[in-house]
Amino acid sequence: MEATREIYWNVTQVWVMYALLVPTAVAAGYGVYRHLSRWRRGQPAARFDRPRERVRLVLKHAVAQRRTARDAFAGLFHALISYGFVVLTVATTVVALDADFGTAIMRGRFYLYFQSLAVDVFGALVMVGVLMAAARRYLRRPRKLVHTDEAGLILAAVFLMCLQGFLVEGWRIAATDDPWGAWSPFGNLVARASRRLMSVEAMRTAHVSAWWFHLATSFAFVAWLPYTKMMHVLTAPLNIYAASLAPLGAALKRVDFEKTESFGVNTLGGFTWKD
């Protein structure tokens, strides 16, 4: 028997998910559009030359996260959350490809090593990263940190989505007696505890309720993301790629103080699109 799982096990009316995807995409798309509109109001600036150097900058600062790593504690939890999110996003994409396009990727060793083991481990690491970030923000409280309600809501939402994922996975493993369940270590912990406390029918009910709650939470988060500082997840690599490669101070122009009526930038259109 080849290792895999039924994608929509215990879930009916899947069309509702696709219906909810429409307002989610509209809300998120409008948020991205607002950012693009502001950028387009800026002055033109050539920032796509020397592509090799720009790719190196992206690898150094966006992928390797050299700047963030200067603070060891912050660098660690930032890496756990960001790399974990990449893995979870890839895993979600694989599920969508299998469900909607019949690609049959979720099979065999790939299903066991990546879709089960790696996804579980990285999901847990995201939760650890969130707890570390919360400890820094609310216990250590460094002076340089800007404290906002939004930051706390983002951390809570990310932690909740990961927790929901483990509950949904664990109840599915337990209720179906999944022979491959041990490959999902944290979901399997939920499954083992649930078998002692819940009937199969109770697990099925809990599973479908948590599945829809997880979907609603995830869609709401995606719709909200472009309106929060989490937008930097998408813009940071682009921002780094489009950084000025000119020597420091090369962009400064000589100012005639007698003839110039205004100094600096006093309108949005005075900046370049990159600024």
Model-derived segments and their meaning:
Residues M1-K274:
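Membrane-embedded alpha-helical bundles of multi-pass integral membrane proteins
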